[in-house]
């Protein structure tokens, strides 16, 4: 399960992309799977770019350092290391999903690695649903699995402040088409969302203090 509700102080850059959402996966026997995890890899370091003290309501962040050495300093080497271990190149993947705190970070990282828009556009949902933090990459993967065909190869890379990235090399199996119609697609959930204005958002998130 990967899910979260993004927090951001009013007026902070974090609030601009704040979202909420999650995705859950059942991990089981390969013969029953709609996608196989072929290999995983992690890249971690002691890089504090985002934090919240126990007594504070909103998190703090290191502003531009959240990009580099934070995001780019982990997502890019994690993806590169996993492809090196697998002996693959960007051209070997039909789809790619990166952690997406905003649209600029993942597209820049993906272009740096040599991926194309056709490979990442299906799973890049942040422009429509915002930054779901721990759920970001996993929700993006659901959108990809909704349309993937048997044999399609997928690269997914997460990111967590602190900091670290986990990479996953996945392959869709022949069973993928059997499960794609058993539940509403991620795209259908997005298309039926209800837009609200900022005043409604502030009230629903209880950002107005009355004392």
Language model regions located:
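Active-site-proximal alpha-helical scaffold in enzymes
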Residues: 1-4, 9-10, 17-19, 25-30, ...
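Short, hydrophobic/amphipathic alpha-helical packing segments
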Residues: 72, 76-79, 134-138
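A beta-strand-loop signature enriched in Asp, Gly, Thr, and Trp
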Residues: 108-140, 144-152, 156
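Glycine-rich phosphate-binding loops at beta-strand->alpha-helix junctions
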Residues: 96-108
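Hydrophobic alpha-helical scaffolding
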Residues: 61, 65-72, 95-99, 127-134
């Amino acid at each position: 399960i990967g899910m979260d509700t993004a927090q951001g102080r009013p007026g902070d850059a974090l609030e601009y992309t704040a979202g909420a959402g999650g995705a859950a996966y059942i991990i089981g026997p390969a013969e029953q799977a709609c996608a196989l995890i072929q290999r995983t890899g992690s890249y971690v370091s002691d890089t504090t770019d985002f934090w919240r003290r126990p007594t504070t309501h909103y998190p703090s962040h290191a502003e531009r350092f959240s990009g580099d050495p934070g995001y780019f300093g982990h997502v890019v080497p994690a993806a590169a290391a996993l492809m090196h271990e697998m002996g693959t190149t960007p051209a070997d993947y039909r789809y790619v999903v990166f952690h997406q705190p905003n649209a600029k970070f993942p597209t820049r990282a993906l272009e740096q690695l040599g991926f194309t828009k056709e490979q990442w556009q299906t799973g890049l949902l942040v422009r429509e649903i915002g930054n779901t933090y721990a759920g970001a990459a996993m929700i993006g993967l659901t959108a990809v699995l909704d349309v993937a065909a048997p044999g399609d190869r997928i690269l997914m890379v997460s990111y967590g402040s602190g900091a670290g990235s986990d990479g996953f090399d996945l392959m869709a199996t022949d069973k993928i088409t059997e499960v794609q119609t058993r539940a509403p697609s991620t795209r259908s959930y997005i298309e039926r969302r209800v837009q609200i204005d900022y005043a409604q958002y502030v009230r629903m998130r209880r950002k107005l203090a009355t004392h």
